[in-house]
Amino acid sequence: MLVTSSRKPSARTRTLCKLLSRFIAGRCMTRGKMGMQELLEFAEGGPLIVIGEYHGNPGELSFYDEAGELLFSLRFTDWYSKELDSYWFSGIEPKLAGQGEIAEAFKVFFHFQRVENDKIDQLPPSSTLIVVGENDIDFMGSGKSLFKLNLRGFKKY
């Protein structure tokens, strides 16, 4: 899975690109002048996530399948925990928790193991978890929130 940015990303967008790719055990790449076809070639037959900007800050995630079809997009504002600086990413795929249309879209796109909300406490302490709520998506590691996307919009194509 490839995570990339807009053509001229800000420092915050590059940071989110790196964090997201490390969290989902994917690859991060600076886009530069590449078009969609070239990005799909670099994705090596896998799905693609493009981080777009709004006023110089990361503000949209667009999710593409292997053929380059846009599946869905999220508009958001981001938040980072101070715990993030000292967190070591294991490279293991995270688990997925949550209900609703966005959680279902994530399940289809990522193919991560789904965990029921009432079973989150039973996960091993070193687990990474994506918790999809109605208003936010929380990326958790070792039981703590590492970064969060506060949702502003969701569009399915």
Curated annotation (Swiss-Prot):
Molecular function terms, GO-annotated: rRNA binding
Name the UniProt record assigns to this protein: Probable Brix domain-containing ribosomal biogenesis protein
Any coiled-coil regions, as ranges: none
Keywords, alphabetical: Ribosome biogenesis
Keyword Electron transport: no
Superkingdom per UniProt: Archaea
Transmembrane segments: none
Function description: Probably involved in the biogenesis of the ribosome.
Domain Brix: 1-157
Matches recorded under Gene3D superfamilies: Probable brix-domain ribosomal biogenesis protein (3.40.50.10480)
Biological-process GO terms, alphabetical: rRNA processing
InterPro entries assigned to the protein according to its UniProt record, in alphabetical order: Brix (IPR007109), Brix_dom_Rbsml_bgen_prot (IPR023548)
